[in-house]
């Protein structure tokens, strides 16, 4: 599997602008970078939004969950002031807005689908809505990942041409990883950096999978991982890490 090394800006350039906002994604383009990693979930009206958490408390001026909200509610949510006054009024983006931005700029994206907590029906609605939005891409590359491998398997059944990455925490990366990836239909494994060894990276690569590691903020560690055969790293400081 011949894959160019990739540096994914984790939630955009989140040290320079509020995470998972258009401001953070614009910073990526301004720095000449090619890939972002971002997170998607769904509102009550079916709108797919960019947000890491299942509540609004940490990164906005609101609190509580958003599964009962609609697109109209997004106008009242400030996702920037917590980071800095210059970002006051920054909104939670929608996936629709991000796809438009990708088409305009050529930016590529790893879309992490959050493991929706509202049940199977809403999860399937999220999967279908993401597939519909990604179908509007005209040129940029996309990779879809998730910690919920059952969700990824359902996604693959509906969109077999979109490459998938199985996310793993170190504590959940068991010896059956190859069976899981093959059953899901994944092309990539996304392991946590903590405890990752050269031997494990080589095993992943020898089995035919790309290896994108999270979250790596040390340029020296990134270089080591690439030398081991990793195909990508997710980082909060993508502007400080060379791609190869």
Language-model segments: residues:
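Phosphate-group recognition and catalysis centered on beta-loop-alpha active-site segments
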Residues: 1-244
């Amino acid at each position: 599997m011949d894959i160019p090394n990739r540096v994914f800006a984790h939630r955009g350039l989140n040290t320079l602008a509020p995470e998972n906002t258009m401001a953070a994604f614009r910073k990526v383009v301004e720095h000449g970078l090619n890939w972002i990693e971002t997170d998607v979930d769904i509102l009550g009206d079916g709108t797919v939004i960019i947000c890491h958490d299942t509540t609004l408390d940490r990164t906005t001026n609101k609190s509580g969950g958003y599964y009962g909200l609609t697109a109209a509610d997004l106008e009242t949510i400030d996702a920037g002031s917590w980071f800095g006054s210059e970002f006051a009024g920054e909104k939670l983006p929608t996936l629709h807005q991000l796809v438009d931005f990708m088409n305009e700029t050529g930016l590529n994206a790893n879309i992490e689908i959050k493991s929706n907590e509202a049940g199977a029906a809403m999860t399937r609605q999220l999967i279908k809505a993401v597939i519909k939005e990604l179908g509007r891409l005209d040129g940029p590359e996309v990779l879809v990942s998730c910690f919920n491998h059952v969700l990824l398997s359902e996604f693959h059944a509906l969109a077999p041409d979109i490459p998938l990455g199985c996310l793993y925490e170190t504590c959940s990366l068991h010896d059956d990883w190859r069976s899981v990836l093959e059953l899901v239909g994944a092309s990539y494994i996304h392991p946590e950096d903590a405890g990752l060894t050269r031997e494990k990276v080589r095993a992943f690569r020898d089995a035919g999978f790309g290896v994108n590691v999270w979250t790596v903020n040390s340029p020296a560690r990134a270089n080591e991982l690439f030398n081991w055969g990793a195909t990508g790293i997710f980082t909060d400081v993508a502007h400080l890490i060379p791609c190869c």
